[in-house]
Amino acid sequence: MKLLIDIGNSRVKWARSEPGRYTFGGAFATDASSLAEACESQMAALPRPEAVLVSNVAGMRAGRLLADWASARWVVPVRFVRSEASALGVVNAYPNPAQLGVDRWLGLIGAWRTRRDACCIVSAGTALTIDLLDAEGRHRGGVIGPGLAMMRAALASLEALGGAAESCDGFFCNRTGPALSSGILHSAVGLIRESQARAARLLATEPELLLTGGDAETLRPYLETPVRLVPHLVLEGLHAVAERMP
């Protein structure tokens, strides 16, 4: 068994990787002050893994704390996965492959593992990232925008003037709070739709839309094309990397 850990900006997710399958284990908030305690609470009872594979976008401190905890708990190698020029059938579009966020890289690998065809991968988390993968496994690049929470934080001063953001039944709203919510939501939806349209023109086919991340369920009802929810796409990619290891 190998232990897979995805350290995101907001959440840490983990899973067990075994030949032919992986099992989601749980999640907790990315908080460096209590990271070791959260790991101990959720993972201490696991049998000793052969190795620990980590995707980390939350900074060096979080990664170091996790590695120190895992090494002390089991005395096992801790491997931090890095973006590569190509791996497992996927070709990185970035001239400097290491500059592509490892979460996006593993999302591409996870998507290719589950569906070997063109797809548009939307990760709706702290940031909203959209990456295009063609039918040959080539990454065509991506776009990055603010996530829903980031937009709310940026508009906090307007909320103070007009009340806290709240849902709006339609697109146009007659109070500041709902108008903010509508604008935030449809800014994200608009970027996804524009990305889909441009992807279809570039590839001359309609790529499947894969949706992952903490805000995936919020955005899904507003997307007009068929959507496939993939809750733990980074862990899917980590599992593929784990299976490649000797």
Curated annotation (Swiss-Prot):
Alphabetical list of SUPFAM superfamilies matching this protein: Actin-like ATPase domain
Record-listed substrate binding positions: 94, 101-104, 176
Binding site for ATP: 6-13, 126
Subcellular location: Cytoplasm
EC number: 2.7.1.33
A molecular function (GO) term: ATP binding
Reactions it catalyzes: (R)-pantothenate + ATP = (R)-4'-phosphopantothenate + ADP + H(+)
GO CC entries: cytoplasm
Cofactor(s) of this protein: NH4(+); K(+)
Predominant localisation class: cytoplasm
Function text: Catalyzes the phosphorylation of pantothenate (Pan), the first step in CoA biosynthesis.
Protein name, UniProt field: Type III pantothenate kinase
Gene that specifies this protein: coaX
